[in-house]
Amino acid sequence: MNNGILHQNYNSKKFDIIKISLASPEVIRSWSHGEVKKPETINYRTFKPERDGLFCAKIFGPIKDYECLCGKYKRLKHRGVVCERCGVEVEQAKVRRERMGHIDLVCPVVHIWYLKSLPSRIGLFLDMPLKNVEKVLYFESYIVTDPGMTPLEKKQLLTDDEYAEALENYGYEFEASMGAEAIRDLLADTDLETEIESLQAEYEESKSTAKKEKAIKRLRLLETFQASGNKPEWMVMTVLPVLPPDLRPLVPIEGGRFATSDLNDLYRRVINRNNRLKKLLDLNAPDIIVRNEKRMLQEAVDALLDNGRRGRAVTGSNKRPLKSLADMIKGKQGRFRQNLLGKRVDYSGRSVITVGPSLRLHECGLPKKMALELFKPFVYSKLRLGGYATTIKQAKRMVELEEAVVWDILEVVINEHPVLLNRAPTLHRLGIQAFEPKLIEGKAIQLHPLVCAAFNADFDGDQMAVHVPLTVESQLEARVLMMSTNNILSPASGQPIITPTQDIVLGLYYITREKEGARGEGKLFSNYDDVSRAYNSGTIDIHAKIKLRIDRQVFDTKGNTYNEKGVVNTTVGRALLLNILPEGLSFSLLNKVLVKKEISKIINQAFRVLGGKATVVLADKLMYAGFKYSTLSGVSVGVDDMTIPENKEAKVEEAEKEIKHITEQYQSSLITENERYNNIINIWSKTSDEVGASMMDAISKDTVMVNGENKEIESFNSVYMMAKSGARGSYNQMRQLAGMRGLMAKPDGTMIETAITANFREGLSVLQYFTSTHGARKGLADTALKTANAGYLTRRLVDVAQDLVVIEEDCGTDDGLMFSAIVEDGEVKVPLVERALGRTLAADVVTEKGVVLLEAGTLLDENLVEILDDNGIDMIKVRSPITCKTRRGLCAKCYGRDLARERKVNVGESVGVIAAQSIGEPGTQLTMRTFHTGGAASLGITVSDIKVKTAGKIKFKNIRTVTNKDGQNIVISRAGEIIVSDTMGRVREQHKIPMGAVVPLASGKGVEIGDVIATWDPHAQPLITDVAGKVVLEDVIDGITSKHTYDDLTGQQTIEITSISQRTTSKNLKPVVKVVDEKGNEIKSISLAVGAVLNVTDDSVLEVGDVVAKIPLEGSKNKDITGGLPRVAELFEARRPKDAAILSPCDGMVRLGNRDTKEKQRIEILDKSGHIAEEILLPKSRHLVVFDGEQVSKGDVLADGPTDPHDLLKYKGLEAFADYILIEAQSVYRMQGVVINDKHIETIVRQMLRKATILDEGDSKFVKDESIELVRILEENDRLAKEGKRLVEYELTLMGITRSSLSTESFLSAASFQETTRVLTEASIHSQVDQLRGLKENVLIGRLIPTGTGLAVRKESNKIEKMREELGVEDNMIFTEASSFNTEDTLFENQIEKEDKDINDDIEESLRNALESLDF
């Protein structure tokens, strides 16, 4: 008996896949334990369930354990007996959570999901519009199901009158009916095979794309039904399953009333209507009444399944829509997200956090009361083992009375038992870390100050939760993987996240500053102890400059050791810190003024050279010192610390005078409104900066007497020190405190032109205060929106990347991405060394002389990237997650180094989730606004030349030049760049050169710092001719396509091309400048864009390099740039921008002006033989950047606009696309000063490229133009290659993260993300199988996730499975009695034991490796 139970429970957990499909009536009946016939629930007097009702004990099982309803059979001994009086089986009461019932519907009912979830599956299957299907279903029209010999058509709709007429004319030769029966008959009658064949023929023959698309959609649906084993008529239900009663409870509340689940109401409506319909049919009621009742039954079932999907939602007594079955599973409060993906856990507590400055990094302070509650079971068992209590009850009593011995035992229990601390919101994995608890009095949890940055915690009332890992394994994982001391580096950037902030920084800054003429200056000390004694006795000042003899051992990153010896100039404070500095680090790290950045460097260096353990100790010591000396320094802020500059009033008056002058100019109509506004904003910006500068001058210098003369030294002003050290505050805030507040922004981002001239020390007037509130309120509103948006972005990212895990060491590819330094505005923002660190080389690194420096497959560490730098390598090929060939995962080599652990990434690391967290976590720091360029935001001066900042050589890239009559070299190419390399050949600068720029030097020439390498007109883009000849103007007609103006002063005529939208007639005219030779043959034609101002007239003579026309740049620059969070979301969602740039689909020559239509212009691209290879239609308002007859390559820009990532991938290839996303996303984060490693963005990009489009199906089952998972195509190609058949050809398709998440192979993961109804409908028709590969699916069904230690466990269990199969052992043999084992089983048991030992050894080994790498 017992084994049966075990077996039953064991099996319920053991499955490999989950399949979802349509349920047939037979299947529904097989689930059921009886039919629910009555709408009654329970008897309100006896509280017993009614028989055959919704809570019937006979159908669903007993209410009390092992007790039938009437009480005849009680106790376990009667288990399994069915009571003959009440018909209830004697069982556990929990079967009421599992047993289902059913309702036999009198007439069929359509399942609303397959009707209304778009696209309507029933409509598509029957090839009928949804409206028509609804008319039939809700009894408005008849539908012909069998036309017989009549001229009626199958599926033709008939109104009542038409039906009556047809009956009169044809009698009963045809069949027509209405309601779900009709639909069911039509579905059942469809012959799938013949229908599929006719559709395939239609698809082949059809010429129109719309028809083809419709045919292919229908074809796919029919093929799905054919393949999945689902019958189409199952979309119409004849039997309705009833949920087990304990999942829709009815609970008595005081006052004799009941609280009930909405589902019971919905079921009661269905049963009532079903029973009424049965009665009406028995009575042979009139057709119209029956019809109405059938319609109501359909509506009742609709409401039960998905309330509100059709028509108005059914409401309860309180006017609230009832919660249907569909509502139970979808949304944040649904089953998936509320109960399966996020559960509440036992053994946890929460409390306010407070600062624990005396803790060590791996400790936290846990209030005694809390600890006792959390560790109760451990305390109970220790009390029994120690002999203090004989029973658990006694132990419990002792704990409740809080006897003295309990506290002693609690100390023992919590010793070295780590607890997890978590602060919500947990934006990245460092939001949960493990600490060793220390018992403290009070009720607040004490947190170590250095981990605040990781938790983003402060002590203004934040709360944190504590969780206790119970099992030994979980304690081990907490200690090895989650301990705060093992999480020194941030997984997002690889930089230390444990760096001192605020008070600590201030203290260290204060004691490392020097003061002229301080007490004890110039003394020489022989060691640290002498300095310490002298300082403690008060003979020397902490800021005094002294000399100190040192003798230390120093290690470098390459592992070499050298001695640091001799006398150094230092200060007393720095000498005192020498005691903290561990052996191996140079004193020069400390021997300077320690601002925040420098302290970070020390910790970084310590980690690189000495490893984790020493770094943790150093960080703690730095913290103690920082706190100690910031206390001793007595730094505080007073009103007098804010020094207002003396020249402030004069500056403000001067600005007001200038503004008055500008206003007068505006009133005399000499300048425009826009110029007036911009000038005023400029003046106030400048004034504000000048006042700020004078304030900084005043506040940053002090005058002291040294040897009787005045000397200027750096100030010890408190506010200045706080800002300078990086502890708190910034220059901007100081300016507002003591300078002037300056310009304020309106909520839309534009500046208010009346600046605030007061500062906070003087105080603001009412008007100025009001002006300030504008921006401040916007800030608060923004923050609230931003948090939600950033959270949603993180959720989408996690969802798309959750199943990406490192599953093998090496995929063996030699593909990769080309990496070079990132250059913005000509400056190197991110050097190659930083980008290459921690990546694997995909190709050998070779010098110009052909020497192989580093071989492919090398993992670049700090020492190896220096080799790149030393040899002036400016481009390398590295392996990338995007190009990794591993299927359903990644390989360790393509991913490279694990940023948080500084070694190669482990197999089993869930890199997808880490990537998503790294990108999403800083989301709240990004701005929400779009930047308005033009106006106040772009106060930068317009750039019109390029001066080099590095001495070296210049090199042209994609630059074509012509020499004009003045001997100048004019650039005539569009996307040209000049690269500046230093003397070593390393790329130091990279500048984009606009068309029309003059370049004085040739490629390959040497340059010095400050040399000008290009100049151009910043206000206009010139159109330049590269041929000489005579001008013929075509379609340049005054008043129609152009505007001719004469300047009376100079007598010159200007011709400006007007916009098409301003023309009333002649919309097909295209203004062109043609250059002809002496015989009048055309050599070149230059099309003129809107706004172009001509420099030539008819019959002008042109030389090579002359300017034909200029396009003013004002109009094109004043666009909004989407910045911050919306930009990142836009990139990852792969949205197509409005008016995107048009790229050339192939190589060839451009031909314009041929067969243009009224509204559109046509670009034709001719191949080498002169045939049209591709043609593109564009609105005439779009500005083309190519000329007639120009040669273009695939992917060249034809019409400018923002980049469309889809086109970039299609025409320029994977690498160009990857580059674009990386650079764009990184520039947003860089603006906010956030460092994220490239590989995280690449990891997400990989997930956006999971699908591919079939170009040629080969010998596969796929259909051309179908979009399919890349993995499936590759697997199919492997199969075809084995059989020697034609392979599938495909191209990668780009999908945004939301679409990518919804189209994953796992329907569980997709359904728990968004659009649950749609996903489940789709999956059930396909009879989809979920292989449970990802993390989310396994969390949903409550298993270990297949990553980290879970992956090891899964691999081992798969091994055991395999052995089971080989030995032919069934599962239940494990549960048979030992005596009945045969030899084979015993052999198997031994094998299992050995395997178990192996598993333990494996896990032990992986943990040992982890421990070793962590330096314990």
Curated annotation (Swiss-Prot):
Zn(2+) 2 binds at C811, C884, C891, C894. GO terms for molecular function: DNA binding; DNA-directed RNA polymerase activity; magnesium ion binding; zinc ion binding. One of its GO terms (biological process) is DNA-templated transcription. Gene3D superfamilies: 1.10.132.30, 1.10.150.390, 1.10.1790.20, 1.10.40.90, 2.40.40.20, 2.40.50.100, RNA polymerase II, clamp domain, RNA polymerase Rpb1, domain 3. Zn(2+) 1 binds at C68, C70, C83, C86. Its cofactor is Mg(2+); Zn(2+). SMART domains: RPOLA_N (SM00663). It catalyses: RNA(n) + a ribonucleoside 5'-triphosphate = RNA(n+1) + diphosphate. Keywords: DNA-directed RNA polymerase, Magnesium, Metal-binding, Nucleotidyltransferase, Transcription, Transferase, Zinc. Mg(2+) binds at D458, D460, D462. Its EC number is 2.7.7.6. GO terms for cellular component: DNA-directed RNA polymerase complex. Binds 1 Mg(2+) ion per subunit. Binds 2 Zn(2+) ions per subunit. Belongs to the RNA polymerase beta' chain family. The RNAP catalytic core consists of 2 alpha, 1 beta, 1 beta' and 1 omega subunit. When a sigma factor is associated with the core the holoenzyme is formed, which can initiate transcription. DNA-dependent RNA polymerase catalyzes the transcription of DNA into RNA using the four ribonucleoside triphosphates as substrates. HAMAP family: RNApol_bact_RpoC. This is DNA-directed RNA polymerase subunit beta'. It comes from Francisella philomiragia subsp. philomiragia (strain ATCC 25017 / CCUG 19701 / FSC 153 / O#319-036).
